[in-house]
């Protein structure tokens, strides 16, 4: 039988939220070249050897995860999701992961470090067993998706939400730690822009996962929740070791582990599950770095949150009131 091909009809909503996510993704689109990084050089020269080493490695680890999410994760999930608009949003997000986020880290490297050091840190990525393990676990679930199988797709979506809303944050911690102290500010602006993107990526894929989950029997729901918690624990145990490997030399492992647990709970909430870890106080310096309200900076030195594109507006809780959005439509 000849296959009938249909076109994407953007004049008709596929659901209550996808076009809103499309609009938000487009509104906050940015490019690495829009952020000048030379202003970080003076601070960088005064950092200790261990501080520079940890900073380079956390960004290299983030680069690997963004590369795999852009090249493998989002495209595979998009392939198995129904709906042209949903596929478009996922593919837009995939583009941001590698072409924008990963490239941004390379721009930071090229500004702060010589070629030899950059090559060494990318070799470290291939050799670090904890980093490789989490990449293997996540990518393995992407590649395990079976055609017309919602359960394997749900599991891959859980992995995607964990990557975007949980695993990235051991790497985000250190740039935010400096940013919250007013150091390495240009690099910190890039991290805040990436955080803004990852926030909506995690929420969107989480909503798609919840659709699948909510269609299941109570017995199947229990099984899927058990899978999600088991995967969380496996990733968490590996993340603890990864954190010690990176942050022991700068004395911040204890703080980073709190931040990891905080974001693991956020990832679970994106999936519609209750928090798993107890609530803890997060380092106020890092929370200050996470404050994405508009900052007053010189127009020509920074883009980030202090630079106003005509079409960009900061992400707010109101952006996720889907019922209100539907009524307006």
Swiss-Prot record:
Belongs to the ribonucleoside diphosphate reductase small chain family. The gene is nrdF. GO terms for molecular function: metal ion binding; ribonucleoside-diphosphate reductase activity, thioredoxin disulfide as acceptor. InterPro entries: Ferritin-like_SF (IPR009078), RNR-like (IPR012348), RNR_NrdF-like (IPR026494), RNR_small (IPR033909), RNR_small_AS (IPR030475), RNR_small_fam (IPR000358). This is Ribonucleoside-diphosphate reductase subunit beta. The active site is at residue 105. CDD domains: RNRR2 (cd01049). It catalyses: a 2'-deoxyribonucleoside 5'-diphosphate + [thioredoxin]-disulfide + H2O = a ribonucleoside 5'-diphosphate + [thioredoxin]-dithiol. Its cofactor is Fe cation.
């Amino acid at each position: 039988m000849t296959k009938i091909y249909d076109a994407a009809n953007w004049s008709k909503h596929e659901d209550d939220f996808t076009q809103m996510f499309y609009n938000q993704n487009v509104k906050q689109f940015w490019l690495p070249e829009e952020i000048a990084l030379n202003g970080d050089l003076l601070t960088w020269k005064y950092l200790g050897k261990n501080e520079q080493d940890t900073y380079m490695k956390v960004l290299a680890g983030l680069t690997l995860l963004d590369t795999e999410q852009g090249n493998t994760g989002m495209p595979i999930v998009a392939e198995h999701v129904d709906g042209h608009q949903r596929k478009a949003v996922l593919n837009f997000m995939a583009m941001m992961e590698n072409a924008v986020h990963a490239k941004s880290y390379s721009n930071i490297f090229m500004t702060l470090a010589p070629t030899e050091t950059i090559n060494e840190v990318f070799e470290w990525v291939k050799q670090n067993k904890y980093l490789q393990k989490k990449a293997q676990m996540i990518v393995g679930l992407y590649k395990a998706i079976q055609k017309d199988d919602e359960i394997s797709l749900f599991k891959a979506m859980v992995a995607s939400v964990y990557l975007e809303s949980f695993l990235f944050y051991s790497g985000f911690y250190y740039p935010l730690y400096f940013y919250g102290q007013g150091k390495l500010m240009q690099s910190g602006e890039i991290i805040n822009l990436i955080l803004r993107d990852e926030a909506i990526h995690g929420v969107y894929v989480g909503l798609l996962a919840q659709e699948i989950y909510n269609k299941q029997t109570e017995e199947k729901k229990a099984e899927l929740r058990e899978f999600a918690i088991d995967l969380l624990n496996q990733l968490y145990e590996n993340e603890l070791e990864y954190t010690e490997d990176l942050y022991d030399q700068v004395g911040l492992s204890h703080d980073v582990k709190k931040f990891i647990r905080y974001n693991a709970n956020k990832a679970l909430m994106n999936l519609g599950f209750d928090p798993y870890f107890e609530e803890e106080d997060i380092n106020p310096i890092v929370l200050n770095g996470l404050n994405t309200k508009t900052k007053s900076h010189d127009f020509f030195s920074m883009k980030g949150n202090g630079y106003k594109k005509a079409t960009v507006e900061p992400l707010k809780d109101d952006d996720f009131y889907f019922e209100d959005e539907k009524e307006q439509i």
